[in-house]
Amino acid sequence: MRTKITLACTECKQRNYDSMKNKKNNPDRLEMNKYCRFCKKHTLHRETK
């Protein structure tokens, strides 16, 4: 079952991206390097509740 998640920038805490993930295959919190338009650079984005 795929659920909707939100990715937040670790530097400025802005919630920039929405994505989907399969909780059965990926039970841990997702972390990705994505572009943050507020910081104007690539930063680590983590899954939020």
From Swiss-Prot:
InterPro entries: Ribosomal_bL33 (IPR001705), Ribosomal_bL33_CS (IPR018264), Ribosomal_bL33_sf (IPR038584), Ribosomal_zn-bd (IPR011332). GO terms for biological process: translation. The keyword Ribonucleoprotein applies. It comes from the Bacteria. One of its GO terms (cellular component) is ribonucleoprotein complex. GO terms for molecular function: structural constituent of ribosome. Pfam families: Ribosomal_L33 (PF00471). PANTHER family: 50S RIBOSOMAL PROTEIN L33, CHLOROPLASTIC, LARGE RIBOSOMAL SUBUNIT PROTEIN BL33C. HAMAP family: Ribosomal_bL33. NCBIfam families: PRK00504.1, PRK00595.1, rpmG_bact. This is Large ribosomal subunit protein bL33. The gene is rpmG.
